């Protein structure tokens, strides 16, 4: 199974990476994609990285983040990432950043993005269950930013045929193993779009009140008037592991 995952991994500068860049360019959108990343040479060439790619509407790669720490059993599959991707990308509608799954429980990872005046945060999860919703709402409130919490949809029938399945699952091809839960949260921590479960549809949301990211910072600004640089020394090693 691991060999198959490695074979099907995405090389950022390879065919699959170029395909994602072409999609962003063709549809003139900012595209954020979570991938199982493989590299052909150097550090991690026999491993996978849990990665997040940000493309601009011109197809250029704006940011490439590798999850800092594989979580629990993920350590069987993934190598550790680095701080190179702990940054935001400037867009016409504000700066955008993102974290992967349990990185949202790492306070310093959150602070690294808060310090860069993040306006839109992409929180990617396997499925956005209750605790993940809580982490996403907390991030929005703490960072005074909009959060797009994205959850995967996976049904039994989507699994590779090579995987042996218990009889109960064989008889339920439409059963959800990952049931989504995607949502959109405002800078006050309130839902703009309630969690959407058990559906595989494209959701379109219009955000017009961009000033709310400023208004909410009157009461809480964790990188400004609610931060104590005289007490805490904050720095990030943003070097890419070669």
Regions found by a protein language model. Give the residues of each.
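Short acidic/polar active-site loop segments enriched in Thr and Asp
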Residues: 119-120, 146
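Active-site catalytic loop in hydrolytic enzyme cores
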Residues: 9-22, 38-119, 125-138, 168, ...
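Active-site gating loops and adjacent loop-to-helix segments of metal-dependent hydrolytic enzymes
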Residues: 1-5
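Helix C-cap/helix->beta junction micro-motif
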Residues: 26-27, 143
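C-terminal beta-strand edge segments of enzyme domains
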Residues: 152-242
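Short beta-strand scaffold segments in enzyme catalytic cores
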Residues: 34-35, 50-54, 87, 182-184, ...
């Amino acid at each position: 199974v691991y060999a198959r995952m490695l074979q099907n991994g995405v090389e950022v500068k390879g065919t699959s990476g170029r395909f994602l860049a072409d999609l962003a360019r063709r549809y003139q959108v900012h595209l954020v994609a979570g991938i199982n990343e493989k590299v052909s040479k150097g550090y991690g060439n026999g491993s996978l990285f849990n990665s997040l790619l940000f493309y601009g509407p011109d197809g250029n790669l704006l940011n490439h983040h590798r999850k800092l720490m594989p979580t629990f059993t993920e350590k069987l599959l993934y190598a550790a990432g680095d701080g190179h991707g702990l940054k935001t990308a400037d867009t016409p509608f504000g700066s955008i950043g993102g974290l992967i799954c349990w990185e949202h429980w790492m306070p310093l990872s959150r602070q690294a993005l808060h310090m860069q005046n993040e306006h839109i945060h992409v929180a990617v999860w396997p499925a956005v269950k209750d605790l993940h919703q809580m982490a996403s709402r907390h991030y929005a409130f703490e960072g005074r930013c909009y959060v797009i919490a994205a959850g995967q949809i996976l049904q039994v029938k989507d699994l590779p045929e090579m995987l042996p399945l218990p009889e109960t699952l064989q008889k339920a091809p439409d059963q959800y193993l990952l049931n989504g839960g995607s949502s959109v949260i405002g800078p006050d921590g309130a839902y703009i779009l309630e969690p959407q479960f058990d559906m595989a549809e494209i959701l379109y949301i219009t955000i017009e009140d961009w000033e709310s990211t400023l208004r909410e910072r009157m009461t809480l600004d964790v990188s400004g008037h609610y931060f104590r640089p005289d007490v805490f020394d904050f720095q990030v090693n943003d070097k890419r592991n070669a």
